[in-house]
Amino acid sequence: LKCNKLVPLFYKTCPAGKNLCYKMYMVATPKVPVKRGCIDVCPKSSLVLKYVCCNTDRCN
């Protein structure tokens, strides 16, 4: 997950209200993202799922 301050055209900007980028993946397979996108609050990781969040509203 790249946290971007400057936005090239192909990076997406999160909508208002969901200004954190995040990536979710299984703890067993950290190289394979399950889901990525924008969220309002960074979820807590569990034993099965791990979340990585950016504090910027621009992500790839």
From Swiss-Prot:
Q: Which Gene3D superfamilies match?
A: CD59
Q: Which InterPro entries match?
A: Cytotoxin_Cobra (IPR003572), Snake_3FTx (IPR003571), Snake_toxin-like_sf (IPR045860), Snake_toxin_con_site (IPR018354), Toxin_cobra-type (IPR054131)
Q: Where is the signal peptide?
A: none
**Tissues expressing the protein:** Expressed by the venom gland.
Query: What is the protein name for this chain?
Result: Cytotoxin 2
Summarize the protein's role: Shows cytolytic activity on many different cells by forming pore in lipid membranes. In vivo, increases heart rate or kills the animal by cardiac arrest. In addition, it binds to heparin with high affinity, interacts with Kv channel-interacting protein 1 (KCNIP1) in a calcium-independent manner, and binds to integrin alpha-V/beta-3 (ITGAV/ITGB3) with moderate affinity.
Q: Where in the cell is it found?
A: Secreted; Target cell membrane
Organism expressing this protein natively? Naja naja
GO biological process assignments: killing of cells of another organism
Q: Subunit structure of this entry?
A: Monomer in solution; Homodimer and oligomer in the presence of negatively charged lipids forming a pore with a size ranging between 20 and 30 Angstroms.
Example GO molecular function term? toxin activity
Family classification = Belongs to the three-finger toxin family. Short-chain subfamily. Type IA cytotoxin sub-subfamily.
Q: What is its main location?
A: secreted
Q: Give the intrachain disulfide bonds.
A: 3-21, 14-38, 42-53, 54-59
Q: Report one GO cellular component.
A: other organism cell membrane
Q: Which keywords appear in this protein's UniProt record, sorted alphabetically?
A: Cardiotoxin, Cytolysis, Disulfide bond, Membrane, Secreted, Target cell membrane, Target membrane, Toxin
* Cited Pfam families: Toxin_cobra-type (PF21947)
